[in-house]
């Protein structure tokens, strides 16, 4: 509502950040951002009017993993009624059991791993008992209803989710380990890879890994070099919507 405050990780998916800065701001809702590795120090950013704390773990593009228990405990100690949300797309809602960690609402782009075949678009939101009536009513009032075909396709994807995620884990780790040893690569950001930011929290809190990770080249490419680099991949296509059976790559400048 007007006058409320949202506290969001600065590694949230860019459209999520844009929704706050370009839409909610016009409705009188302010947003501030915090470092994904802040842990219990998040208390320094909480305000009396903080109503939403928005997490995404691992972070978009740069893949930092939150210390979720520390964040949740800190938020509850200062603004106990604030709703803690997480974008749980990377973990497909199953590799990280968000509600078990005290999070109120867990959302994901089910277009990715739940559908699993890049042939439908759907989002999901699950919540605890405290938030259920509010979530149900707002989804109803905003007309957020899935069509029958998409519901069927998503339920089909759920049948193979476990075996697909195990393969994503294995394949992505093999590729990331190979890249980590490559002379042209400065850093690999994969939560399951030792040395990645927040790896210890992934190891403690997650039950596996999906297939999305990032890496940084030692040389910063200009536009022509980058286009040539991407155009010469034979096994990876360039596209946004990961989570299917294809191998995809996308260039990004998160700074």
Where does each model-flagged region fall?
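Conserved PLP-enzyme active-site core in the AAT-like
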Residues: 1-182, 189
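Conserved C-terminal alpha-helix-loop-beta "cap" of PLP-dependent enzymes
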Residues: 185-255
């Amino acid at each position: 509502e007007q006058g409320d405050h949202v506290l969001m990780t600065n590694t949230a998916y860019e459209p999520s950040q844009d929704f706050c800065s370009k839409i909610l701001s016009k409705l009188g809702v302010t947003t501030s951002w915090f470092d994904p590795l802040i842990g219990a120090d998040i208390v320094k950013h909480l305000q009396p009017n903080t109503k939403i704390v928005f997490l995404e773990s691992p972070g978009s593009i740069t893949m930092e993993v939150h210390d979720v228990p520390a964040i949740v405990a800190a938020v509850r100690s200062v603004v106990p009624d604030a709703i803690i949300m997480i974008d749980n797309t990377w973990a497909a809602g199953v590799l990280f059991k968000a509600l078990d960690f005290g999070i109120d609402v867990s959302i994901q782009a089910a277009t990715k791993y739940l559908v699993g075949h890049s042939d439908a678009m759907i989002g999901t939101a699950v919540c605890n008992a405290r938030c259920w009536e509010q979530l149900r009513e707002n989804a109803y009032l905003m007309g957020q209803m899935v069509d029958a075909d998409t519901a069927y396709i998503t339920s089909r994807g759920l049948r193979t989710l476990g075996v697909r995620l195990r393969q994503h884990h294995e394949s992505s780790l093999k590729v990331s380990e190979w890249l980590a040893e490559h002379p042209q690569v400065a850093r690999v950001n994969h939560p399951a890879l030792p040395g990645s930011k927040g790896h210890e929290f992934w190891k403690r809190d997650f039950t596996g890994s999906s297939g999305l990770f990032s890496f940084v080249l030692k040389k910063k490419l200009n536009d022509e070099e980058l286009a040539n680099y991407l155009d010469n991949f034979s096994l990876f296509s360039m596209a946004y919507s990961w989570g299917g059976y294809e191998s995809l790559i996308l260039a990004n400048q998160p700074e």
